[in-house]
């Protein structure tokens, strides 16, 4: 936690899996803003819906009382291996609705990879959308990050968006 504070950060994405309660306690004490997320990553597996639902329920039940949590993350880079399809979108709607049923006070989000694209319907299911962009890292042109975000904001001026990963492997 000390290193995070030294960086001047006030927001932490606890990505891809459940984290120790001790760290959530540290985040509460330090006044951090936390994004908690289930490990629904890279590929949608049609037979995995019950697993994602179970993990989301457990994440919320175990961490609901932590003041640090501002949003529940429903997936990460889900379109890397899975082309956009109805079952994947349906599962995102199920998870998003579940989060709001279990916790009416917090937002939902997901982390999209660039190939998801700003017009992909999955990017518009949750309350917030964030992008894992490595423009300027894997491909030249750091300025492309600004262009990406400006374009998204131009198309969707009332949509909350952010960076979820960037640079040296996030």
Model-derived regions: residue spans:
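Substrate-binding/catalytic cleft of secreted carbohydrate-active enzymes
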Residues: 2-4, 11-170
């Amino acid at each position: 936690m000390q290193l995070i504070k030294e960086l001047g950060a006030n927001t932490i994405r606890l990505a891809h899996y459940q984290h120790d309660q001790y760290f959530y306690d540290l985040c509460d004490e330090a006044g951090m803003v936390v994004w908690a997320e289930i490990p629904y990553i890279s590929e949608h597996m049609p037979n995995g819906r019950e697993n994602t639902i179970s993990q989301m329920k457990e994440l919320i039940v175990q961490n609901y009382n932590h003041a640090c949590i501002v949003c529940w993350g429903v997936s990460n880079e889900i379109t890397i291996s899975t082309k956009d399809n109805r079952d994947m979108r349906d599962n995102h709607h199920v998870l998003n609705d579940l989060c709001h049923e279990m916790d009416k006070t917090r937002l939902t989000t997901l982390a999209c990879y660039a190939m998801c694209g700003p017009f992909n319907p999955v990017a518009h299911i949750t309350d917030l959308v964030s992008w894992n962009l490595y423009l300027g890292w894997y491909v030249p042109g750091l300025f492309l990050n600004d262009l990406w975000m400006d374009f998204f904001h131009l198309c969707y001026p009332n949509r909350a968006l952010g960076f979820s990963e960037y640079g040296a492997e996030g």
